C-alpha cells in the first residue's frame, strides 16, 4: 500500500513483473483497478489514480498486487461474527468489451450460480476452510468482529482460490 506515487512507482520498477495490478485503495464503484501490461502503463496508471485523482479520494492510496489469471467468482455470506453461511455464488462480467477486454466497469452483467464455483464439488469446502472461516476468525481475534453480510471477491487460479477483495 502506497501513499505517494513516487514510492509506488519505485516499487513497481523494483518488482519489474508485468502485467501488474494497480488498485485505488478506497471505494471506486468497481472501477478503481488498472492492469498495466508494461512499466510505461504502470507509471501512467499510478499517476492517473494518485495524482490526477481519476477516482477521487479513493485514489489517495494505491495497492500494488500480483496479476492473477482465472475466472472471478463472487460469494456473499451471512455472519454473526463467529459462524459464516455463504449464499449462492455469482460470476460478474466487469470489462467493457467482449472477451474480457477493456476497462473495468461497475458491472456489465452477472449470472448465478457461478458454473466455475459449482463445477468443482470441493471448491466451496476449500473456500470455507481456507478463506471464509479464517477471515471471520481473524477479524474476531483483532477485536473487530463483523456481523452482517460480507462479500468475497475471488479469483480461481490454477493454484486454487485467491481473495482479490472484500466488501461489506
Predicted regions and their residues:
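Internal nucleotide-binding/catalytic subdomain
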Residues: 32-168
Amino acid at each position: 500500500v502506497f501513499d505517494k506515487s513516487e514510492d509506488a512507482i519505485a516499487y513497481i520498477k523494483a518488482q519489474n513483473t508485468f502485467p501488474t495490478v494497480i488498485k485505488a485503495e478506497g471505494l471506486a464503484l468497481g472501477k478503481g483497478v488498472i492492469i498495466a501490461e508494461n512499466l510505461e502503463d504502470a507509471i501512467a496508471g499510478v499517476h492517473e489514480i494518485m495524482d490526477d485523482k481519476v477516482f477521487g479520494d479513493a485514489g489517495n492510496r494505491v495497492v500494488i498486487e500480483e496479476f492473477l489469471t482465472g475466472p472471478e467468482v463472487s460469494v456473499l455470506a451471512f455472519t454473526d461474527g463467529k459462524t459464516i453461511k455463504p449464499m449462492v455464488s455469482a460470476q460478474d462480467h466487469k470489462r467493457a468489451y467482449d472477451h474480457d477486454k477493456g476497462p473495468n466497469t461497475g458491472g456489465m452483467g452477472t449470472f448465478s450460480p457461478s458454473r466455475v464455483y459449482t463445477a468443482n464439488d470441493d471448491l466451496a469446502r476449500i473456500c470455507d476452510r481456507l478463506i471464509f472461516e479464517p477471515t471471520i476468525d481473524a477479524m474476531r481475534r483483532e477485536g473487530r468482529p463483523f456481523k452482517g453480510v460480507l462479500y468475497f471477491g475471488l479469483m480461481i487460479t490454477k493454484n486454487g482460490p485467491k481473495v482479490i477483495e472484500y466488501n461489506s
